[in-house]
């Protein structure tokens, strides 16, 4: 379906759009779409992982400020293209890197620094899980990170909610 500019503006102003946000390895991306999936605006923020204590990670502050910058970039795109402001959405979806390790307690506190998909410190766990399931479990998968934390007797494991 082809949308003219006025119809897109109406959808934005009426809160009939959907926002998708993705925390990728190198960029945080935001895309505003119409109900049929047609993209109408986008924003992004470039970020860089950090190697700290031999763990690839992102700081929580990087996540928050990166999301804010990405959203601001999206809003600028909407203003530039449609002279409109985003004030209401019909739906919102957030995704993140498909592999990594984020462990939270019952109060939603991050227990250890975010371990990204780039970490390959889970060989023992990946082998045990692969043999147990009869299915290849790569070192980068979240389950391998969790089980390696168990095998390493990491102090945070018993507080995971």
Residue positions per predicted region:
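Glycine-rich phosphate-binding/catalytic subdomain of phosphoryl-transfer
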Residues: 73-161
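N-terminal glycine/serine-rich phosphate-binding loop of ATP-dependent small-molecule kinases
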Residues: 1-112
């Amino acid at each position: 379906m082809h949308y003219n500019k006025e119809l897109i503006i109406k959808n934005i102003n009426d809160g009939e759009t959907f926002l998708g946000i993705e925390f990728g390895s190198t960029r945080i991306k935001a895309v505003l779409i119409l109900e049929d999936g047609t993209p109408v605006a986008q924003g992004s923020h470039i970020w860089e992982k950090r190697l700290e204590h031999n763990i690839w990670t992102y700081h929580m502050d990087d996540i928050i400020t990166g999301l804010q910058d990405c959203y601001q970039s999206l809003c600028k795109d909407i203003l530039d293209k449609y002279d409109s402001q985003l004030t209401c959405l019909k739906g919102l979806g957030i995704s993140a890197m498909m592999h990594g390790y984020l462990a939270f307690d019952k109060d939603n506190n991050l227990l250890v620094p975010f371990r990204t998909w780039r970490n390959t410190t889970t060989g023992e766990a990946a082998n045990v899980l692969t043999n147990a399931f009869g299915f290849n479990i790569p070192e980068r998968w979240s389950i391998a990170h969790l089980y390696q934390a168990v095998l390493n007797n990491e102090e945070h494991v018993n507080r995971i909610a």
